[in-house]
Amino acid sequence: MSKRNQVSYVRPAEPAFLARFKERVGYREGPTVETKRIQPQPPDEDGDHSDKEDEQPQVVVLKKGDLSVEEVMKIKAEIKAAKADEEPTPADGRIIYRKPVKHPSDEKYSGLTASSKKKKPNEDEVNQDSVKKNSQKQIKNSSLLSFDNEDENE
């Protein structure tokens, strides 16, 4: 049994004609188990992937107020600097959660204007409906069979 555990696969050497053919064609070897185990490098931390000069959008200035290429580059630099100042990444790589900043209640409702006129009639209607239902139940109850003394005598 112990000899079975010692069995391993040895890859034979590639023939010379295959090596020459692959070299002429430009064949690249696919990933192997060993290459898949290697940890890939993390991508750049910048989320802006269009930093290359040939991948930048074409800037066209039609009017006086339009942005020029230099102004766009300045704005991008300012945005990157602001992002760098806002959230420094922790050295150990852990994510830190923070509670959101609470705003005063005045700011919260400053833009909202709602009237309760629609709500009040609805509440009144609900109350009136419940009164009507109660009166209907009383009417139905009175029309039900009743066992009076007269019925008992017969």
UniProtKB/Swiss-Prot annotation:
Acidic residues bias spans: 43-56
Domain of life (superkingdom): Eukaryota
Keywords for the protein's UniProt record, in alphabetical order: Acetylation, Phosphoprotein
Renumbered residue ranges of the record's region Disordered: 23-63, 79-154
Residue numbers of N6-acetyllysine PTMs: 108
Pfam families in the record: DUF4604
InterPro entries reported in the protein's UniProt record: DUF4604, KIAA1143-like
PTM annotation (Phosphoserine): residues: 50, 146
Stored PANTHER family: GEO02494P1
Name of the protein described by the UniProt record: Uncharacterized protein KIAA1143
Organism (species): Homo sapiens
